[in-house]
């Protein structure tokens, strides 16, 4: 898939844009993998959709949850439907970080915007924002491809 095709498919007003959060998340992520020429999730122990976890709350209660996409040593990724709060998605990922082996990048997306939040031990977090319409730019593609291939470059 080419970046232009991806933008057309996921732009506001398209049938794909109208997909619900869960159906849209996996389809969008697979398309991103194809645009960037990286493998799709397929190993429940290192790179998968719906990575299960159990988090412990401040009162000691335990809650089960799932990260939409997880790649060991690279990222945890949480999707929201277009227009929904990416801040809420980030809060969710921050709570999930420890049970997910503290990935160095926390990524949130509403399929129109991808926000990459660095989560490196001992350093302040940085936020990098990429918009759907910018996906054809080579420098944006290079930065996003680095999520899979060189997370330390963030």
Regions found by a protein language model. Give the residues of each.
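Low-complexity, compositionally biased segments
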Residues: 24, 31-34, 46, 71, ...
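Short, basic/polar, glycine-containing "phosphate-handling" surface segments that engage DNA
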Residues: 1-12, 59-63, 73-74, 79-94, ...
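N-terminal, well-ordered alpha-helical segments
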Residues: 26, 30-34, 51, 67, ...
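Charged, often low-complexity linker/regulatory segments
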Residues: 1-47
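Acidic-residue sensor for enzyme active/binding pockets
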Residues: 21, 50, 78
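Active-site metal-binding core of divalent-cation-utilizing nuclease and nuclease-like domains
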Residues: 39-72
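Short linear sequence elements within intrinsically disordered, low-complexity coil regions
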Residues: 11, 33-34, 41, 52-54, ...
